[in-house]
Amino acid sequence: MRVLVRAGLILLALLIIAGVAGGFWARRQLTASLPQLDGTLTVAGLSAPVTIARDDLGIPTVVGKSREDVARALGVLHAQERFFEMDLSRRRAAGELAALVGSRALPPDREIRVHRFRAVARRALAALEPRERAVLDAYTAGVNSGLSSLGTPPFEYVLLRQDPKPWLPEDSLLVVLSMFITLQDYTGSYESTLATMHDVLPAEMVAFLAPDGTEWDSPLVGPAFSVPPIPGPEVYDLRTKRSKLPEHIEMRPPRKEETRSTPNFQLPTPNELPTTNAQWSSLIAAFMGVDGSSPELMLGNESRSNDAIGSNNWAVAGRLTEDGGALVANDMHLTVRVPNTWYRAWLEWPDPSNGSSPIRLIGITLPGVPALVVGSNTHIAWGFTNTYADWSDLVLLELDPQDRNRYQTPGGWRNFERHDEVIEVAGRAPEHVSVMSTIWGPVIEPDHRGRPRALRWVAHDAERLGVASAALETARTVDEAFDAVNGLGTPGQNFVVADEQGHIGWTVYGSIPRRAGFDGRIPQSWADGSRGWNGWLAASEYPRLRDPQSGRIWTANARVVDGEMLARLGDGNYEVGSRARIIRDRLMARERFAPRDLLDIQLETNAAFLSRWRDLLLKTLTPSVVASDGKRAQLRDLVE
């Protein structure tokens, strides 16, 4: 018995020692992967020393002797603090997540491989201007230097038992492409839905369900559109469920297997922690939302269907402020995540054209890209919201009756291009995916009638893709900023800007296709050449608004303009204008502004869009109605 007790005590002691040793090892691994916050770091390739100072919030100020040196230092910072996030962004766009986290990431990888963004990024890299390429190369070298200077790789790779792959210049372009995926409809689902509705529903029903606007619209140019009436019983009778639908169309709720649900992820208990590589991969994949049933939720890259996406910005002219300086406010509503999407920084280097004053960029950067996304250069300040304009079109393909491997083009019959995409998968053999392409873009799934389609999307145009705009970094006026951003190869954004002279303005940041022969609302054939994209709008053709009479500008993902300007932008499923209405009303309610007043609008909690429904509920849930039903009483308590 004593022998057994002694053996048990020895075993317990060994387990305790192993646990303590494991804890020390884990702590050491985690500590060694943390960024260097002080001291000196040797980085090859710098033309002169760079200083990095952090404020009380840890926000770095980077001061160097050249744009390339500052880009290199920013790469070091991004790599040491956000490399895993950067890795996920490039892999998301390239369709290479499964190589990191295993087979659970195959559905989103398969879905995105149709775009062949790795090839797009490589073509874009080859087309960069020498100045932009030099900045990108310096940033890339900084990323790899920062990563290699860590004592151990970021802890996520330790858990996955993987080694981080070096950063490539093309990877920064993939990060830009990942934002296209986040901010635009990369499957053509909105246009496809509209086409189906037009095909199977009465026109009155389509007008009601997919109106051109709502009573909440508060555009900068033009009035709100009239609201279509609710279709009467002669169109669709809710009591008898009779409608003027074609006989082959059935209206029914979706079956269970046709619906998607958000993964119900729960953190494991200590006894459930993974012990194998596969288990860790599965856990991390589940935590990030990499689930075949919901690829749109993965990795914090929001799809267009995610209602959490939305942003607000507005500006007031200097003539309305207390000190005569124009003001810009911006809040970008990407999904809240840890770490945050953005990385705040102050970047500074000498102005080659004016040695007496430096170029200063203050605001937020995107890990993986060597540029300031939103902020100020001390002469102008700018902010973004997603436009929800129409950035893609579905093309109906006409197949050769004699050879289904050919499709009609304005130049005659043409063979489909076929590509064998190899998806590497951690822990198992790679998977091969066959992708077909046309002169307009990749072939996607057929429509509801079985007709083949291709997707024409601005993100596929490599020659317009970029990572940094030197012209925006040095712009001094609203007009110079307009010229800098019109035509850039980035996701189309509402660009609201103010300059130090007190001027304000709005335009579109990004490349706008020039549609010919159609409006882009529903899919059509481009085979005879009468319809299609005829290049891109010139800067002089872009919608621009400078110093409106009201002295106020606002955008919130809703429609901003009407008439010819709206025709050029198209409708990519604009948001209901309730946020824009609230912002406009709050701006119009004041005659003078200070920064605090703009912050008060940002902190607004009034949900005006819901007020009418609250009033209707309270009117309906009378004391006599709720008296006999506890659930109704609870509902009234919630909305009172």
Predicted regions: what they are:
Residues 1-17:
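N-terminal Sec-pathway targeting helices
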Residues 20-260, 264-271, 276-327, 332, ...:
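Substrate-recognition/specificity elements adjacent to catalytic centers across diverse enzyme folds
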Residues 115-127, 460-466, 561-565:
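Acidic/histidine-rich, surface-exposed loop or edge segments in extracytoplasmic proteins
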Residues 126, 141-152, 289-292, 474, ...:
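Sec-exported extracytoplasmic/periplasmic mature domains
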Residues 197-203, 463, 471, 476-482, ...:
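Ordered core of a single globular domain
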Residues 308, 337, 347-371, 375-380, ...:
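Glycine- and hydrophobic-rich flexible loops that cap the catalytic core of alpha/beta enzyme folds
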Residues 444, 488-590, 626, 631-632:
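Hydrophobic alpha-helical segments
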